[in-house]
Amino acid sequence: DVSVDEVLDELLPDLMDIYEGKKIHLVRTKETEPFVIRCNLSLAQILVSNLVKNSLVHNREGGELHIATTPSSLTIMNSGEHPLDGEKLFRRFYRSIDGKKDSTGLGLAIARSIALSASLSLTYKWQEGMHLFLLVKESQKKS
């Protein structure tokens, strides 16, 4: 079992340093109980890292990045210009219309594959000017 909170605590300082030039404002919230998933540690690190990197790469300068964990979920929200195609977003090599040159289009496809192998659901939605990625345990998934 892997604590997503611990993975985030290790990854966030380095990732925020790498993207500090974008002046992204990070808001991190967590509950007393961590979000623990049944997954190989290396795969959990790749899953979380790909989601956070995606939210940094595709954020605007001076944008927001909200990362929240509960005992049953991880929510990552970042500033955006417009909604993305939720059907195509998790496909390999998918790039949005304004796709970034430094994006391979693989990160979210890999994240979704790891999530599925760990009985997790990874979904996307557009909410109030923010891209929202939600990772939940399949047993906790709400319709």
Model-flagged regions — what are they?
Residues 118-127:
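Glycine-rich ATP-binding loops of the HATPase_c
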Residues 101-110:
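Glycine-rich phosphate-binding loop
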Residues 82-94:
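Short conserved segment of the HATPase_c
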